[in-house]
Amino acid sequence: MNILISNDDGIQAAGVRCLAAALAQVGGHQITVVCPDRERSATGHALTLHKPLRVDPVREGFPPEVQAWACSGTPSDCVKLGLDGLLQQPPDWVIAGINQGANLGTDVLYSGTVSAAMEGLLEGIPSLAVSLASFTHQDFQPAAQVVLMLLEKLSLKPLEKPMLLNVNVPPLGLAEIRGMVLARLAWRKYTDLYEKRVDPRGKAYYWLAGEVVEEEVDPCSDVRAVAEGYVSITPLQPDLTAYAAFESLQRWGLSAFGF
């Protein structure tokens, strides 16, 4: 398979290097890595519009058969440039990850990892966003093995149409993971707290902090699945239309406004 890999943790991140090495070890894959040249977490689907993108080849830390690039742009820039500027032909898969930290519930709206995978889907390419649900756990091998298992399953039973699968892996050994489950996005709420500081020149600046204040209790949610030791798999789509609201909104009689 021809696979394009990106992330939002940057080209130096352990997760993307582990994933590229695992795919290369299997053999039979043409692997291209295009990642930000620095940390780009929580950049969402931002694109670089007002300055050029620059890329540099990266060899250290990747198997020799993997072509890797560091890009000055966002995660979405990386995938877009990879598809339209660096690859000679469209890949079979776009994979974003392995991210350090979960991308669960409504957090996907901020996620550079999920947005990188979504960019692949917007180009009609099936995509995976893969995250290790811990900011401190450093063993990415189980998550890499989950990716290999998913690709094998999907090669035997291909998707009916391209889609994005958001995959969150609990920070456990492979033998400890209880299985894979389909799960819906949870609704996560935070205490958004900006910590005010003052620089040596007396000018105020702010750091965003916050903690989850309400965890999902729905047993079908991705948050619950990962908490119970399962790999959560959530199909995502770019269409954010709230179709269920159409009926109630039609009662407004919009045509009567004279548009």
Swiss-Prot record:
<keyword id="KW-0547">Nucleotide-binding</keyword>
<dbReference type="GO" id="GO:0004309">
    <property type="term" value="F:exopolyphosphatase activity"/>
</dbReference>
<keyword id="KW-0479">Metal-binding</keyword>
<comment type="similarity">
    <text>Belongs to the SurE nucleotidase family.</text>
</comment>
<dbReference type="GO" id="GO:0005737">
    <property type="term" value="C:cytoplasm"/>
</dbReference>
<protein>
    <recommendedName>
        <fullName>5'-nucleotidase SurE</fullName>
        <ecNumber>3.1.3.5</ecNumber>
    </recommendedName>
</protein>
<keyword id="KW-0963">Cytoplasm</keyword>
<keyword id="KW-0378">Hydrolase</keyword>
<dbReference type="InterPro" id="IPR036523">
    <property type="entry name" value="SurE-like_sf"/>
</dbReference>
<feature type="binding site">
    <location>
        <position position="41"/>
    </location>
    <ligand>
        <name>a divalent metal cation</name>
    </ligand>
</feature>
<feature type="binding site">
    <location>
        <position position="9"/>
    </location>
    <ligand>
        <name>a divalent metal cation</name>
    </ligand>
</feature>
<feature type="binding site">
    <location>
        <position position="99"/>
    </location>
    <ligand>
        <name>a divalent metal cation</name>
    </ligand>
</feature>
<dbReference type="GO" id="GO:0008253">
    <property type="term" value="F:5'-nucleotidase activity"/>
</dbReference>
<comment type="function">
    <text>Nucleotidase that shows phosphatase activity on nucleoside 5'-monophosphates.</text>
</comment>
<dbReference type="GO" id="GO:0008254">
    <property type="term" value="F:3'-nucleotidase activity"/>
</dbReference>
<dbReference type="Pfam" id="PF01975">
    <property type="entry name" value="SurE"/>
</dbReference>
<dbReference type="GO" id="GO:0046872">
    <property type="term" value="F:metal ion binding"/>
</dbReference>
<dbReference type="GO" id="GO:0000166">
    <property type="term" value="F:nucleotide binding"/>
</dbReference>
<dbReference type="InterPro" id="IPR002828">
    <property type="entry name" value="SurE-like_Pase/nucleotidase"/>
</dbReference>
<feature type="binding site">
    <location>
        <position position="8"/>
    </location>
    <ligand>
        <name>a divalent metal cation</name>
    </ligand>
</feature>
<dbReference type="InterPro" id="IPR030048">
    <property type="entry name" value="SurE"/>
</dbReference>
